[in-house]
Regions:
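Surface-exposed patches in mature extracellular/periplasmic domains of secreted proteins
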Residues: 84-89, 138-146, 259-267, 338-339
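Short glycine/proline-enriched loop/turn "hinge" motifs that connect secondary-structure elements
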Residues: 101-103, 165-168, 290-296
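C-terminal accessory segments enriched in acidic
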Residues: 18-21, 41-63, 196-199, 215-356
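Active-site/substrate-binding loop(s) of hydrolase catalytic cores
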Residues: 106-115, 120-245
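Secretory targeting and sorting signals
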Residues: 1-41
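Solvent-exposed, polar/charged alpha-helical surfaces in well-ordered, non-transmembrane soluble domains
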Residues: 70-73, 124-131, 188, 192, ...
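A short loop-to-beta-strand scaffold at the N-terminal edge of the catalytic core in hydrolase folds
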Residues: 93-100
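Short glycine- and acidic-rich boundary segments immediately preceding or forming the N-terminal edge
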Residues: 41-93
């Protein structure tokens, strides 16, 4: 949601608690689609919507840090031992950097959300996915048997509480540009968790900060697939193939859903992003030894359109549907043979500031 003007909410550390009112967490999972503030749709071109500087935006239906603590506690307690919740460390403001582990399969899958604190709906989507992975659904059982899934619902809790993109203290920086210098405690903690868990596959959930249209159309682009956070020349052949396979599994799942108007994310080469260094290796926090490039074989990201309020549920499904598809393909073995011939034909989108 970069570039959008949104209100700042009050920050404040909350201690990690081990028991909560379960009903509140149920509301968190089931009710984030509710609208608490009614406002007219802002102007947009075409199709919007876009947040305007003077627009009243309610964050009451968006998962905050306390909601994440509560939801993870509920899921862990009701999972009958299938889910364990741990802390990778503490944020700059002292919040626990919480993650959940579900499954005990031989392949580790890393899933993180909200590395940018003001990209709101990925947290709720990840909590829904975790809740489902702890269920008796046959697909969930298969994933648990074949994968060990590391789930990080809120990578940047301080930024999320402040409703800003960056971290807050001791440095206000983009945490998705900190896997070379590691100046923030969040980056150090999650790098160590990545090294410890050695995920073969990784997925990072984001929101767009603009309202693009699919090239050659007037269709609002609602989902962008990011198969390359770095140039393919920086990846191994296996990594580049796996990234495209993960991308096409995601795209095909959303095509069946409809209305996503999918496009490529712009071609970038950002070496200090978290996923980039998962693929490349070669960097480490002070006092640590860098790992080799071969640790992670595939790492991609999603960009979903921003602004919920009247469409929270749809935005969350744009995350949950492709994520579950990739998890399933990784678990049932189809990912490794998935056809990537349609990847190059995916359109790009024309970026445009909201409301202009």
């Amino acid at each position: 949601m970069a570039g959008a003007t949104v209100p700042t909410v009050t920050t404040g550390g909350r201690p990690l608690r081990k028991s909560f009112v379960a009903a509140a967490a149920v509301v968190l999972i089931a009710g984030l689609g509710a609208v608490s503030t009614a406002t007219a749709d802002p102007p947009h071109n075409p199709g919007g919507p876009c947040i305007q500087p003077d627009q009243n935006v309610s964050l009451s239906s968006v998962a905050g840090y306390a909601d994440v603590v509560q939801a993870l506690d509920r899921i862990e307690r009701t999972s009958k031992g299938l889910v364990s919740v741990s802390s990778a460390g503490t944020s700059g403001e002292g919040r626990e950097l919480l993650y959940a582990t579900v499954g005990d399969g031989p392949t580790t899958f890393w899933l993180h959300a909200r590395i940018h604190g003001n990209e709101l709906h990925s947290t709720e989507a990840v909590l829904q996915i975790l809740d489902h992975l702890a269920s008796g659904d046959p697909r969930a059982r298969l994933i648990r048997e074949q994968l060990t899934v590391i789930v990080i619902p809120m990578y940047n809790p301080d930024g999320a509480e402040a409703n800003i993109r960056q971290s807050t203290t001791p440095n206000r920086i983009d945490l998705n540009r900190d896997w070379e210098n590691f100046v923030q405690p969040e980056s150090v903690a999650f790098w160590k968790l990545w090294r410890e868990t050695a995920p073969e596959l990784a997925l990072d959930l984001h929101h767009m900060g603009e309202a693009p249209v699919v090239n050659g159309t007037n269709d609002l682009n609602q989902f962008q697939i990011g198969a390359r956070s770095i140039a393919p020349s920086r990846m191994t052949a296996e990594q580049w193939l796996t990234n495209r396979q993960m991308a096409m599994v995601s795209v095909d799942a959303l095509d069946r859903y409809g209305l996503a108007n999918i496009a490529h994310y712009p071609l970038i080469d950002i070496t200090n992003a978290a996923l980039s260094r998962m693929l490349m290796g070669g960097t480490a926090p002070a006092g640590e030894t860098p790992v080799t490039q071969s640790l992670t074989k595939g790492a991609i990201f999603y960009e979903v359109r921003s602004v919920g309020q009247k469409s929270n549920g749809q935005l969350e499904r744009l995350f949950t549907i492709p994520t579950m598809a990739v998890l399933t393909a990784a678990a049932d073995g189809t990912l490794g043979s998935y056809d990537v011939s349609g990847y190059d034909a995916l359109p790009f989108a024309t970026q445009g500031p909201c409301g202009e």
